[in-house]
Amino acid sequence: GTGDMSELALGWATYNGDHMSMYGVNCSVPKMLVRHLVRYYADTCGEKELSDILLDVLDTPVSPELLPPEEDGKIAQKTEDLVGPYELHDFYLYYILRFGYRPGKIYRLARQAFDGAYDKETILKWLKVFYRRFFNQQFKRSCLPDGPKVGSAAVSPRGDLRMPSDACSRLWLEELETLDEDCVYGVPETKAAGGSL
């Protein structure tokens, strides 16, 4: 199948449909890496026509295109409007799989990494969505077809992610509900900025 690691982590695939194939060629490649690789090739291939096509693909919103287009011909169903920005989800996924960080630490790291791009409410909203989907969609990953591991982490049930299909996200979501909104890097925001407590 063509699904990537980001889609598999979020369960953004139809069970026994597009998630099932003889071989999952992109199963350990996060969506943002796919985008960077396509952009790199478009910039370096030396073929203008191919480069233009690849750049057009990158400019097209991610969509399963299951709904008819809008009257003006634009895509009606945009994945990131429904599940959130893949750059955030890939960030969360990396720190969960590679380092096993807790939700609060990932939230604080994301606030630092995406400062100016996303506000703290947006980061928290999509982190909650990520945890809900990551746990609730494990049943889809438990029966994935074979595929290569090309990075430092993957969601394969035969290697990196040995998680039961009925695992519950409650503890992780409870931690996110109790976060101190003024906390950055584990200390109050005024202290982190050089101020006093």
Regions found by a protein language model. Give the residues of each.
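ATP/NTP-dependent adenylation/nucleotidyl-transfer catalytic domains that generate, transfer
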Residues: 1-197
